[in-house]
Amino acid sequence: MSDISKASLPKAIFLMGPTASGKTALAIELRKILPVELISVDSALIYKGMDIGTAKPNAEELLAAPHRLLDIRDPSQAYSAADFRRDALAEMADITAAGRIPLLVGGTMLYFKALLEGLSPLPSADPEVRARIEQQAAEQGWESLHRQLQEIDPVAAARIHPNDPQRLSRALEVFFISGKTLTELTQTSGDALPYQVHQFAIAPASRELLHQRIEQRFHQMLASGFEAEVRALFARGDLHTDLPSIRCVGYRQMWSYLGGEISYDEMVYRGVCATRQLAKRQITWLRGWEGVHWLDSEKPEQARDEVLQVVGAIAG
């Protein structure tokens, strides 16, 4: 798309970053100054009744800056990147029609990618093919299937661990159904986002500082009643660890503790470690992201001013 035709598109802002990097605080500050409306880009914040462990904006913050796409699913329900793209596009169109600018804030990089580039045309799951793969795994082991994937799609095999049956099974399933590799299909994008997007990523300059923040925030969540929040979910009886909601960082570890699998101290240790790993994955995504303007979360006023400098012209 030419620069001229791109300039005629409606404007949007992406504010991305790892967990515990200060995205929400900056988004709220920006809303005071720019004509923006916030859309949450977070696969955990979509769930009702999961507030403390997801660091969902509190009532005061939501009053100052309402977020769209919060609390839109029960924890028993699934929600895909395709669902997000559909919902986000509808919200963006609504915001643009009102003469304002969508500010998308969050850390679920897959959602940002799906929104920006469109979704690759992957085939739907096929229960028969999946059953055949699982049968083969039961007979030969997942290591054997991983070797098979290495021959079919070495790029995907390098990214998928042999102990990750869900992703391994999906990569093989895609090939058996379509005759094309997962790598081949994911390089084929769908419809690109029809907006002129200004992209920002916020993070502390040092990894140690981020790790420190993550640990502090996990302990803060525990002090705020995180255990009671998960106990209420645990007591429902219809939720389990195969659901995306319960696999969320922190919830999975607390679930293991409540189920008597690990001690409280082990839960805290694993919860902090899992959150650090999540942040590492988010930063890895962002380092390979094109056209992103980096902000230092330890200098919030400077970060705000940098955003205003880049997008200030669109506020008029």
UniProtKB/Swiss-Prot annotation:
UniProt record, GO biological process: tRNA modification
PANTHER family: TRNA DIMETHYLALLYLTRANSFERASE (PTHR11088:SF60)
Family stated for the protein in its record: Belongs to the IPP transferase family.
Taxon lineage: Bacteria, Pseudomonadati, Pseudomonadota, Gammaproteobacteria, Enterobacterales
Cofactor requirement: Mg(2+)
Region of interest (Interaction with substrate tRNA), residue spans: 42-45, 166-170, 247-252, 280-287
Protein name: tRNA dimethylallyltransferase
Residues annotated as site: Interaction with substrate tRNA: T108, R130
Alphabetic keyword roster: ATP-binding, Magnesium, Nucleotide-binding, Transferase, tRNA processing
Complex formation: Monomer.
Record's function text: Catalyzes the transfer of a dimethylallyl group onto the adenine at position 37 in tRNAs that read codons beginning with uridine, leading to the formation of N6-(dimethylallyl)adenosine (i(6)A).
Signal peptide: none
Residues the entry annotates as binding substrate: T19, A20, S21, G22, K23, T24
Annotated binding of ATP, by residue: G17, P18, T19, A20, S21, G22, K23, T24
EC assignment: 2.5.1.75
NCBIfam families xref list: miaA
Organism: Escherichia coli O157:H7
Record field: catalytic activity: adenosine(37) in tRNA + dimethylallyl diphosphate = N(6)-dimethylallyladenosine(37) in tRNA + diphosphate
A molecular function (GO) term: ATP binding
